[in-house]
Curated annotation (Swiss-Prot):
PANTHER family: MEIOTIC NUCLEAR DIVISION PROTEIN 1 HOMOLOG. GO terms for cellular component: nucleus. SUPFAM superfamilies: Winged helix' DNA-binding domain. It is found in: Nucleus. GO terms for molecular function: double-stranded DNA binding. This is Meiotic nuclear division protein 1 homolog. Residues 84-173 form a coiled coil. Heterodimer with PSMC3IP/HOP2. MND1-PSMC3IP interacts with DMC1 and RAD51 and binds preferentially to dsDNA. Belongs to the MND1 family. The modification N-acetylserine is found at residue 2. Required for proper homologous chromosome pairing and efficient cross-over and intragenic recombination during meiosis. Stimulates both DMC1- and RAD51-mediated homologous strand assimilation, which is required for the resolution of meiotic double-strand breaks.
């Protein structure tokens, strides 16, 4: 029997994002090291590396509170990342179109001469390559433009759930601060500094 093929890096990233999109919750690393192997087949050893790659690419948010890192990726972030990617692709397509027009003019000038020059041959090859690149960019732009109204509505609903989840965390943090003040007599600003809580920390409207 052949050995079962492991997941590729991209498959791991996709499955990790599924955890966030399906649960719409906030996790610590230790939580994901338990959930990912069981539900998505991602080995516990690779969870941290996969998470970091998603954080580096702006797909997942990470915030340190006290001594722990918390990870989340609400649907609105994915939408913003998609919008940014589309803007980059459209910019590349525009630049490619301008270069295409410039090369076409150069080739027309080269055709005026009677002989097939090396310059004309080089320009023709470059133009052909540019056409291929432009077609690829067009296809990718169309892919990112395709946005189902149902998906938009799902994102709106997910944002609502995400806001409620964030406010539940805010409730918990305020409760812990209140308990610490009563139990140990700590001043509120000392608690904020100790646990890295910003001064403007509050509920999301």
């Amino acid at each position: 029997m052949s050995k079962k093929k492991g997941l590729s890096a991209e498959e791991k990233r996709t499955r990790m994002m599924e955890i966030f999109s399906e649960t719409k919750d906030v996790f610590q690393l230790k939580d994901l090291e338990k959930i990912a192997p069981k539900e998505k087949g991602i080995t516990a050893m690779s969870v941290k590396e996969v998470l970091q790659s998603l954080v580096d690419d702006g797909m997942v948010d990470c915030e340190r509170i006290g001594t722990s890192n918390y990870y989340w990726a609400f649907p609105s972030k994915a939408l913003h990342a998609r919008k940014h990617k589309l803007e980059v692709l459209e910019s590349q397509l525009s630049e490619g179109s301008q270069k295409h027009a410039s090369l076409q003019k150069s080739i027309e000038k080269a055709k005026i001469g009677r002989c097939e020059t090396e310059e004309r041959t080089r320009l023709a090859k470059e133009l052909s390559s540019l056409r291929d690149q432009r077609e690829q960019l067009k296809a990718e732009v169309e892919k990112y433009k395709d946005c189902d109204p149902q998906v938009v509505e799902e994102i709106r609903q997910a944002n609502k759930v995400a806001k409620e989840a964030a406010n539940r965390w805010t409730d918990n943090i305020f409760a812990i601060k209140s308990w610490a003040k009563r139990k140990f007599g700590f001043e509120e600003n000392k608690i904020d500094r100790t646990f890295g809580i910003p001064e403007d920390f509050d509920y999301i409207d």
